[in-house]
C-alpha cells in the first residue's frame, strides 16, 4: 500500500539562508534512504528557496519538489499530506533540523506500538545561534520513552501544540488535515484532532527537533494575545462542542495552556 516507510513534509517559504541546513539534516538520517521521501513544497517563495530545492532534488532521489502559489503553511502541509506515499508522515519547517537518528527511532517506536497510538512526539529544542532555550514544561512529564494516557491526571497537561510529531498515513481522503481558516493554533488543533480518538500519545526521549527561534517570529509580536482571542474562539467553541457532558481532561488542559 505504501511506497515508503516515512514521508517528511517540508513547507518552504523565503528561507534560502537556512534551507540547506534543514535538507542536510535529512540527508544525515539513519533511516534507509529507500524508505524515505521528502516533499519540498515551495509556497510561492520570492527568494532563491525554490532553486535550492531543485538543486537538492537533482542530486538526491529522496527529495521531491512541488511549487505552489502562496496559500499559507496549513494549505501547504495539506498538499503534502495528500501527496505522501509513506506509512508514516512527519513535519519539518524549512529553517529547522532533526538529529540524525530521529526518523528511524520514531518509525521503529511506531511499529512497536502501532495499535495503541496515532501520534508520536519527541523533544523540541529551541535555539538561536549557540544559545539553547529552556524546554517546554511538558518534558517534566515526558521523561521516558513510552506511551502516555492523556486522560490520566498526571499526564493530561502534556499539551502537544507543536509539529515535532509523526502520524500514521491513513490513506487518500482519510487523513486529518490542517484547518486553513485559522490564523493561529493550527498546529495545536491538528494535533488534538489526531489524538482525540485514542487520547494516548507516544514519546521518544532521544530524538530532537531543533527549532530555530528567529527574531521577529509571529508569536513574539505585540498584540498576539488579542489575535489569539479574535482568531481562535470559534476553534475552541467547535472543539468543546464535540462533547456532551464530559469534556476530555486533555482538551481542558489545552485551553488552560492558552489562557495562561
Predicted feature descriptions by range:
Residues 68-84:
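Glycine-rich, basic loop-to-helix element that forms the pyrophosphate-binding segment
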Residues 184-190:
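Acidic donor-binding loop at a coil-to-helix junction in glycosyltransferase catalytic cores
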Residues 15-29:
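Short, well-formed alpha-helical segments that are part of the catalytic scaffolds
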Residues 101-136:
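Conserved donor NDP-sugar-binding/catalytic core segment of glycosyltransferases
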Residues 89:
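Short aromatic/hydrophobic "clamp" motif used to bind/position activated sugar donors
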Residues 182-183, 203-235, 250:
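Nucleotide-sugar-dependent glycosyltransferase catalytic core
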Residues 25, 42-51:
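A conserved acidic beta->alpha catalytic loop
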Residues 134-157:
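Short, flexible, basic/aromatic active-site loop/helix in glycosyltransferases
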